Amino acid sequence: AAKKRPWKCCDQAVCTRSIPPICRCMDQVFECPSTCKACGPSVGDPSRRVCQDQYV
């Protein structure tokens, strides 16, 4: 079973091949969730935000 993601919406997760995998959510949103510790601008669209936190 997949691990629970720390955010309500994370449709575009990118994970490393390490064991355990380290993942980041690449969803572009207008506002990061309150559980996000490091919210930054999207590279593709600076008006949107991407949570840069990683999770296992």
Swiss-Prot record:
InterPro entries to which the protein is assigned, alphabetical: Bowman-Birk_prot_inh, Prot_inh_BBI
Alphabetic keyword roster: Disulfide bond, Protease inhibitor, Serine protease inhibitor
GO cellular component: extracellular region
Site note Reactive bond, residues: 17-18, 43-44
Disulfide bonds, paired cysteine numbers: 10-25, 15-23, 32-39, 36-51
Regions crossing the membrane: none
Signal peptide bounds: none
Gene3D superfamilies: Cysteine Protease (Bromelain) Inhibitor, subunit H (2.10.69.10)
GO molecular function terms noted in the UniProt entry: serine-type endopeptidase inhibitor activity
Record family assignment: Belongs to the Bowman-Birk serine protease inhibitor family.
UniProt-recorded name of the protein: Bowman-Birk type proteinase inhibitor I-2B
Upper taxonomic lineage: Eukaryota, Viridiplantae, Streptophyta, Embryophyta, Tracheophyta
